[in-house]
């Protein structure tokens, strides 16, 4: 009985201590919320956007002690602080968060613009992956549809132009890479994409020349691919003679069938490349005349036919 009483007394004392400390703890958290919020505002007004961003982030750790209007203001100024500090990755993150929570607010239009501009600035140079560039274009078009009379319209149109130029050079560099490393068919496909989608950024005359030239060099790639596939087929046939189980035999036979299909596919690619090169060369002559590029392409065509 005495032991039970002591245990209950200890538990009761613990609860009293917790309850006594709770108001102090909450008061401390409320103090932190106020401190970081006010520091953030002060730093933002002074133009110290990195410090402002840091303080606003800390203030959100105690958001239960901020009013709804203060939370909205913190989230809005977080977007602007990150953007003005050229921390475009965080600007994208905070802009998306703000738009998700306050899509109809008066600040949403500006935040949406910041999101678009930050996406294109996050996007790397044309040599690397352009996922962010594609997303920037998508968001920019969404912005123009949503805010047709926006004060940011001109800037968003400039973002689209900048993003399209990045995509154009990205495609061009891929084509050039394939061309330089001996994959003319792949290069031709990429040059065609540039011709169709981004002709305004390059000399169409030279692009058309490169497209046709790589079509005419396709037999070199086809020969290399065919030889490689034939080696694989020979290896598979040798292995087929060694295996015993029906399952293994079936698997190897299927592999041989697939490889033989690939040989036929490459031969068809060569045929189609020749036909397209003939058509494209005729169009080239009609548009650009019998210039130096045309004469070089004509020699390649005659070499293929011989």
From Swiss-Prot:
The keyword Signal applies. Keywords: Cell outer membrane, Membrane, Signal. Pfam families: YfiO. InterPro entries: BamD, BamD-like, TPR-like_helical_dom_sf. GO terms for cellular component: cell outer membrane. Residues 1-22 form the signal peptide. The keyword Signal applies. Coiled coil: none annotated. It is found in: Cell outer membrane. Belongs to the BamD family. Part of the outer membrane protein assembly complex, which is involved in assembly and insertion of beta-barrel proteins into the outer membrane. Part of the Bam complex. This is Putative outer membrane protein assembly factor BamD.
């Amino acid at each position: 009985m005495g032991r039970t009483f002591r245990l209950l007394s200890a538990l009761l004392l613990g609860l009293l201590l917790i309850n006594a400390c709770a108001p102090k703890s909450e008061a401390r958290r409320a103090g932190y919320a106020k401190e970081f919020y006010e520091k953030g505002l002060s730093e933002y007004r002074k133009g110290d956007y990195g410090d402002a961003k840091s303080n606003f982030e800390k203030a959100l750790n105690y958001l239960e002690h901020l009013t709804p209007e203060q939370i909205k203001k913190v989230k809005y100024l977080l977007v602007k602080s990150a953007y003005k500090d050229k921390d475009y990755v965080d600007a994208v993150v905070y802009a998306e968060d703000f738009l998700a929570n306050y899509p109809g607010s008066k600040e949403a239009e500006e935040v949406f613009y910041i999101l678009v501009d930050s996406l294109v600035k996050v996007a790397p140079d044309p040599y690397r992956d352009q996922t962010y560039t594609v997303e920037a274009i998508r968001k920019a078009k969404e912005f123009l549809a949503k805010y047709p009379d926006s004060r940011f319209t001109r800037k968003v149109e400039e973002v689209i132009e900048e993003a399209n130029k990045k995509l154009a050079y990205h495609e061009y560099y891929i084509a050039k890479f394939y061309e330089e490393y001996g994959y003319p068919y792949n290069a031709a496909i990429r040059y065609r994409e540039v011709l169709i989608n981004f002709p305004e950024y390059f000399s169409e005359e030279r692009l058309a020349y490169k497209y046709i030239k790589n079509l005419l060099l396709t037999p070199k790639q086809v020969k290399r691919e065919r030889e490689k596939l034939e080696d694989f087929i020979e290896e598979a046939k040798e292995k087929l003679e060694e295996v015993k189980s029906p399952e293994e035999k079936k698997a190897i036979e299927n592999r041989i069938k697939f490889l033989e299909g690939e040989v036929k596919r490459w031969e068809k690619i060569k045929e189609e490349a020749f036909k397209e090169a003939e058509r494209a060369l005729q169009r080239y002559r009609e548009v650009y005349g019998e210039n130096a590029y045309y004469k070089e392409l004509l020699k390649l065509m005659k070499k293929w036919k011989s």
